[in-house]
């Protein structure tokens, strides 16, 4: 079985789920509606697993790299600094990609490693995958820096 994770829900709360069937063209009819009340046992759980933005598995090169960089006596802060230093010194910013990236783009963390290039979304996804693979909760954020679309991470450090 191929397990896929999607970031849903992010937080505890009430969620309305509706399944639609295409009737014709862009017309849809609701087939099923359900309201779910979600109570997360651990608020950081959604930030430890892969999802559509940060897609990885234990076999990913990003996870193998993360494991090779971590030493037994390292704290979460040490690991974060090590991963940050690695990513920022081994990945070059791809200005052409930034100029022509299309809506719906999703990063491939192993492709970013193999090409050694990426945009902010790639940097953030790669670092997030590496941190999550070491059980350090990390949230990838997408928003704007001024009027420029940007991606960055929030890291939750224990202690």
Go through the PLM ranges and name each one.
Residues 122-159:
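Hydrophobic/aromatic-rich core segments of domains that either
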Residues 40, 115-118, 141-144:
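Alpha-helix capping and helix-loop boundary segments enriched in small/acidic/polar residues
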Residues 9-11, 73-74, 158:
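A short, structured loop/turn motif at beta-sheet edges
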Residues 50-114:
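Secondary-structure boundary elements
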Residues 75, 119-123:
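Short, contiguous, pocket-lining structural segments
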Residues 1-46:
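Beta-strand-enriched, solvent-exposed domains that form extended recognition/catalytic surfaces
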Residues 89-94, 98, 119-120, 144-148:
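Solvent-exposed loop/turn segments at secondary-structure junctions
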């Amino acid at each position: 079985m191929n397990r896929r994770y999607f970031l849903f829900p992010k937080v505890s709360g009430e969620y309305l789920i509706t399944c639609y069937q295409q009737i014709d063209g862009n017309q849809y009819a609701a087939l099923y509606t359900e309201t779910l009340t979600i109570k997360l046992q651990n608020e950081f759980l959604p930030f430890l697993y892969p999802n559509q933005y940060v897609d990885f598995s234990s076999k990913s090169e990003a996870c193998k790299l993360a494991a090779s960089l971590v030493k037994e006596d390292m704290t979460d802060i040490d690991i974060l600094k090590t991963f940050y230093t690695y990513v920022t010194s081994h990945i070059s910013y791809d200005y052409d990609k930034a100029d022509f990236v299309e809506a719906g783009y999703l990063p491939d963390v192993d492709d970013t490693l193999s090409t050694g290039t990426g945009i902010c979304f790639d940097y953030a996804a790669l670092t997030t995958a590496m941190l999550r693979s070491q059980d350090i909760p990390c949230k990838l954020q997408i928003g704007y820096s001024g009027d420029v679309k940007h991606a960055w991470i929030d890291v939750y450090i224990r202690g």
